[in-house]
Amino acid sequence: MQPPGRAPTQGRTLIALFEGQQYPVTKEEFVIGRGQKTSDLTIRDSNVSRRHACVVLYNGQYWIVDQQSTNGVEFNGGKVDRKVIEDGDLYRICDHEIQFVYR
């Protein structure tokens, strides 16, 4: 059993769910943005920065980190600069929702 507030990363894969697609996070820096060549998860929207946010692995936990984007990353109605990703978390980037699950 995981202590409260800890993402269950050990032995499980983090999956980003976006527009019916699954994007496994399989590296230490997973880029979310508008840039097709520079992003692991591409959002085609001019309001999304080329390199909008990253998912990074730090001390055994995945974090979502805003990359000083123009429009930010929202969680539970408020903007976040960085946050530990927990199972089921739902983030908004402009008008787009990305949910993260561990499998």
Functional labels for PLM-detected ranges:
Residues M1-S46, V56, H96-Y102:
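Intrinsically disordered, low-complexity acidic Ser/Thr-rich regulatory segments
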Residues F18, Y58, T70, F75:
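Short, ordered coil/turn segments that flank beta-strands lining enzyme active or ligand-binding pockets
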Residues Q68, E74-R103:
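C-terminal boundary/linker segments immediately following FHA domains
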